[in-house]
């Protein structure tokens, strides 16, 4: 049936054209944005996941920047610590040279002073962005943290993980408040010892005796030659501490005798100018620890007390050197870990970007082909609508003469 009121063909052609135009708009939007899922209305699930992961990627980008800053701090501290190791090696070499008879200790001390000033310069200069890990107030250990990663667990809870480094007496060169740093603290060092037979109340027992600053006791083959004495009600000052009890005589000096069960160190002689100690343990025990004459910061071999105890001073420097090497190793390990973490975060960011792309990116080849097809369909729909609109004109021809 042909009607002049209702053009069914034109209505159908127009509906088709509207659908094609709608599809073209969507396709053109995907082509222009490059996204298959650009809004939540396109695909709510994929849009939600992609938006969350983009947010996480922004956080990871901030982590990568923080890692770069942390790496700079660690590398600065590492460079300073590595240089300090070499300087302390030089100081130890100077002290070894000072043990030779006839050397000018004053000249050697001048060289040591320059090396000590270099250590101070290293500790002061090893600062980055206001952070100095080589000198600090370590009254209580201070933890320095470098942002390491941003983590979202299975329940959606996010957290920031850090790489920590503790500043304490084994990791800083100088303590800015006290004397607990590697270079400004005095070390306990292992000292030579000899075994002496000691007669206490009629019972002879062998003791391992470590002597400090007394040549007669630390010399090889030193022996005990004397009698025991039971002193009651008499106080003998020993390094500022008073004792009551048994005493024995060593090289003309009365020293306190310790019961076999006791193992503590005892300072036993102080005449006002020379101070030394005797430690006793059961025979066969390792050498006893004694206090070095000075810290590295306070080395002065022109001082009579230090010059007389160079061996202990060298051992103290050696202990400090071991701590320096350990601290340098720790910083090197952290630097390596930060480098690995930077590489990992970079790869992780790329992987997340790739995953987001798989969810929401448009296939441009496919979209281009679809757009071309829709453009063709649009032209055909317009042609169909044009033909449908000519039907009314055909009806008019029936009434023309």
Curated annotation (Swiss-Prot):
UniProt keyword annotations, A-Z: Bacterial flagellum, Secreted
Pfam families named among the record's database cross-references: Flagellin_C, Flagellin_N
GO cellular component: bacterial-type flagellum; extracellular region
GO molecular function: structural molecule activity
Subcellular location per the Swiss-Prot or TrEMBL entry: Secreted; Bacterial flagellum
Function in brief: Flagellin is the subunit protein which polymerizes to form the filaments of bacterial flagella.
Similarity section: Belongs to the bacterial flagellin family.
Protein name: Flagellin D
Species of provenance: Rhizobium meliloti (strain 1021)
